[in-house]
């Protein structure tokens, strides 16, 4: 198993259904960032069997509507100084613009 170090600063997008991580990666334009971004696919998960996970080593605004449409079960964790300071559980958006 590959180990990816713990984030000191940034965002973790977790509980992504296996196979949906790359779509989220593309829709959020993470390939255009100059910061470190890690997409892990098919990670073992006791809850989900397998899941995808994205770690972003920077703070940025995320479009929760896009995330909620692609995978409404995603959780977003904000990390500061190595500690999770906020965790958001998404749900599908009410309307799409």
Tell where the protein language model's regions lie, with residue ranges.
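Generic structural motif
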Residues: 18, 42-44, 59, 79-83
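A generic local secondary-structure boundary/capping motif
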Residues: 25-28, 64-65, 87-90
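Helix-adjacent hinge/juxtasegments
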Residues: 53-79
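Cys/His-clustered metal-coordination modules, chiefly Zn-binding fingers
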Residues: 72-97
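Auxiliary alpha/beta "docking" domains used to position bulky ligands
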Residues: 50
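A general structural-boundary detector
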Residues: 11, 53, 89-92
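General detector of N-terminal leader/presequence modules that precede the first folded domain
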Residues: 1-47
């Amino acid at each position: 198993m590959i180990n990816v170090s713990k984030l000191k600063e940034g965002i973790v997008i977790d509980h992504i259904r296996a196979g949906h991580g790359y779509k989220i990666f593309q829709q959020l334009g993470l390939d255009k960032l100059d910061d470190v971004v890690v997409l892990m696919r098919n990670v073992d998960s006791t809850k989900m069997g397998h899941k995808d996970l994205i770690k972003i080593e920077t703070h940025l605004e995320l479009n929760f509507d896009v995330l909620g449409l692609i995978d409404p079960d995603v959780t977003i964790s904000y990390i500061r100084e190595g500690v999770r300071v906020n965790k958001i559980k998404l749900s599908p958006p009410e309307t799409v613009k």
